[in-house]
């Protein structure tokens, strides 16, 4: 349901691995948790206005210290002259080229709060630009290079007054009374309480050093995005800003976010999509100024409705959808320089390639070929720069002609040493007849040192969302478990994206129906594979995947053990504890008192069937699926005498911290699966990891 983990690519390495079925793999070591944190993650490329350079971020990890270090790099568009711009590893993000290509604005956490800095290539120095007390997020530079729009949490009564915000925040944070006050819902979201603050968009005047709150009042702007990038952009003449906001009286119960236009000097905002009662967002102006392209849904309250591209004509005020022929989700949008076409990424069959649509004819053309792409940019010569990965290849930066996807050049090789030393496993694909005979795509990753004459334990991983898809991308899950001797399988059952919107829609109102049937038929197919030990099969899942683990507990005894992360256990109490009520209201067809689905599909209603040992992981700050869901489940299993273990991450929400918490997450899984399925032991002692003693001598 959170849109969002994506994109990928594969090339020479897969060929080498295929040619060396036995000895090639044996010469490399098995992939471990430690190897996962040696991966260098390359961020989305940004082409300089003169077309000569690429800026991007690079994130590295320190596993023993639980730290992530992100810095900004620049290189020529042919991949030469690589230079590291920032060298402090202090969360340097969001690089933005100046209009003359002689500098980079970026956000850094080097000071107490995130602020904007300007790096100038002439003196190779960074200069602090903003000093707003509440910090800075997601900056956007105006085309005339004079303004920077950014989002920040402010107290509405203070608006753009930095000192007022600082004083108010200090009293609220440090005063003797520590309480939350709410007179309406959505008083908390994701991992944070509103606490009197809300997100506003401010515009910083670079010359005058002034801040203007262009979204004053009690409304959240930009509203919570359903993917698709930042929720605001400048017009080409730098005179107005288009942004997304939800002005409904009950935003917790509706997806009706609209696009608003406001002068950069502030003033009355105009709602340009008020006629659509579903979600509108991701605005991007055409370079000729005639249109605003944006992503649009049509079904109110349905956050997983098809994302379409619509065009708003700035002269006539009319909007029209131009992607009616594309029946899969659309994510990132970028206008071509001539304003005659739009490039976009779309989720298709376990991939996320780039497509191009001609706005006049509405003809859609594949651009990148079958790749899973995380982010992309274009230059004026028709070159496409993008980051991608595949199951067997970590993320890297690539370039190709947008008109010819047969000639791809890899521009970065930060992970080459790891790829040469460690056995990073590829994935096979099979299709299995699921519910109603509909084919389900299944990815299978075989274990390190695979011998087709042996039998191996299997782990099935079920994705969350539920409206999302597993993709042919690089993930720690896909390598850590095969590295420990398991066959890993992951599939896209009914409800997944990428296989047509009807396939996605069929999970709504049927959480434990067709998706469960799909997964059971996939389990049958996997159990029949000659190299799978059908007596040693386990399953794991996160969010809706965690719910499915709990549903497995209630409906089947096919698995020797389960691992449920951030999973729903009791659907009725979950409704009262979550924050985005539009989701269960739509997917479960109402509220607990007027929909029988809360009982029909709640694992808690089938306790008499429980028998399978289960690992439960949750986050104390998870407001999407409150950690009490995991506690209720653990209490039930313990009372029944069913082997179970509970891990609560104290400082995490729905997504545990990637380097502070996820190592324990992986290790706890390996420990649990080793106990019940017989794969390799976990590399670290779980109890010592919880006590921060696992790396004391390293």
Label each PLM-derived region with a short phrase.
Residues 49-50, 99-100, 143-144, 236-237, ...:
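Residue-level detector of Asp-centered blade-edge/turn motifs that repeat once per structural unit
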Residues 51-54, 101-105, 148, 241, ...:
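Hydrophobic beta-strand positions that form the internal "hydrophobic ladder"
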Residues 406, 412-535, 542, 574-581:
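Cap/lid segment of the alpha/beta-hydrolase catalytic domain
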Residues 76-80, 120-124, 205-209, 263-267, ...:
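Short loop/turn segments that connect beta-strands within beta-propeller blades
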Residues 46, 149-151, 178-183, 187-215, ...:
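Non-catalytic accessory segments flanking enzyme active sites
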Residues 58-71, 86-92, 107-117, 131-137, ...:
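A flexible loop/linker signature enriched in serine peptidases of the S9 family
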Residues 490-698:
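Active-site-proximal cap/loop segments of hydrolase catalytic domains
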Residues 1-28:
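Bacterial Sec-dependent N-terminal signal peptides
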């Amino acid at each position: 349901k959170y849109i969002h983990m994506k994109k990928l690519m594969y090339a020479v390495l897969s060929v080498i691995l295929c040619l060396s079925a036995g000895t090639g793999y044996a010469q490399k070591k098995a992939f471990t948790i430690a190897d996962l944190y040696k991966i260098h993650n390359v961020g989305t490329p940004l082409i300089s206005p003169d077309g000569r350079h690429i800026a991007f971020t690079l994130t590295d990890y320190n596993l023993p210290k639980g730290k992530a270090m992100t810095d900004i790099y620049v290189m020529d568009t042919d991949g030469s002259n690589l230079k590291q711009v920032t060298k402090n590893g202090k969360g340097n993000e969001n690089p933005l080229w100046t209009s003359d290509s002689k500098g980079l604005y970026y956000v850094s956490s080097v000071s107490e709060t995130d602020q904007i800095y300007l790096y100038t290539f002439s003196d190779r120095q960074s200069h602090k630009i903003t000093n707003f007390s509440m910090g800075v997020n997601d900056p956007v530079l105006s085309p005339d290079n004079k303004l920077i729009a950014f989002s920040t949490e402010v107290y509405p009564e203070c608006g753009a007054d930095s000192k007022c915000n600082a004083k108010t925040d200090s009293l609220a944070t440090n005063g003797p009374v520590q309480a939350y006050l709410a007179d309406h819902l959505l008083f908390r979201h994701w991992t944070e309480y509103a606490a009197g603050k809300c997100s506003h968009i401010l515009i910083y005047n670079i010359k005058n050093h002034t801040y203007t709150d262009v979204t004053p009042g009690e409304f959240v702007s930009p509203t919570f995005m359903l993917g698709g990038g930042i929720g605001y952009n400048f017009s080409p003449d730098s005179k107005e800003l288009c942004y997304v906001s939800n002005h409904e009286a009950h935003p917790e119960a509706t997806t009706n976010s609209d696009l608003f236009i406001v002068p950069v000097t502030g003033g009355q905002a105009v709602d340009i999509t008020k006629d659509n009662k579903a979600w509108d967002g991701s605005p991007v102006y055409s370079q000729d100024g005639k249109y605003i392209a944006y992503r649009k849904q049509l079904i109110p309250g349905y956050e997983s409705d098809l994302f379409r591209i619509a065009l708003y004509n700035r002269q006539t005020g009319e909007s029209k959808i131009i992607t009616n022929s594309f029946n899969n989700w659309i994510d990132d949008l970028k206008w071509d320089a001539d304003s005659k076409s739009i490039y976009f990424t779309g989720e298709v069959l376990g991939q996320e390639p780039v497509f191009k649509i001609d706005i006049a004819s509405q003809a859609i053309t594949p651009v990148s070929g079958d790749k899973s792409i995380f982010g992309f940019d274009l230059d004026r010569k028709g070159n496409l720069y993008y980051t991608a990965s595949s199951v067997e290849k970590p993320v890297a930066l690539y370039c190709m002609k947008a008109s010819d996807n047969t000639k791809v050049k890899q521009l970065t090789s930060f992970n080459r040493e790891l790829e040469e030393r460690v056995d990073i496993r590829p994935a096979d694909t099979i299709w299995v007849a699921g519910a109603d005979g509909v084919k389900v795509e299944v990815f299978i990753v075989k274990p390190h040192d695979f011998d087709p004459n042996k039998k191996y334990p299997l782990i099935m991983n079920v994705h969350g969302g539920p409206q999302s898809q597993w993709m042919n991308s690089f993930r720690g899950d896909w390598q850590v478990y095969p590295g420990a001797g398991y066959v890993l399988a992951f599939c896209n059952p009914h409800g997944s994206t990428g296989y047509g919107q009807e396939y996605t829609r069929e999970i709504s109102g049927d959480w434990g129906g067709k998706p469960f049937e799909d997964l059971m038929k996939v389990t049958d197919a996997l159990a029949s594979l000659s190299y799978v030990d059908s007596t040693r099969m386990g399953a794991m899942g996160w969010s809706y995947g965690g719910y499915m683990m709990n549903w497995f507990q209630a409906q089947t005894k096919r698995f020797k053990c389960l691992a449920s992360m951030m999973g729903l256990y009791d659907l009725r109490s979950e409704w009262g504890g979550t924050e985005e009520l539009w989701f269960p209201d739509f997917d479960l067809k109402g509220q607990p008192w007027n929909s029988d689905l809360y009982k029909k599909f709640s694992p808690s209603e089938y306790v008499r069937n429980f028998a399978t040992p289960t690992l439960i992981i949750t986050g104390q700050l998870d407001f999407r699926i409150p950690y009490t869901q995991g506690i209720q489940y653990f209490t039930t299993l313990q009372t029944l005498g069913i082997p179970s273990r509970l891990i609560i991450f104290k400082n995490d929400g729905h997504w545990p911290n990637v380097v502070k918490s996820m190592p324990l997450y992986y290790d706890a899984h390996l420990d649990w699966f080793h106990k019940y399925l017989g794969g390799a032991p976990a590399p670290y002692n779980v109890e010592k990891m919880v006590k921060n003693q696992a790396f004391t001598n390293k």
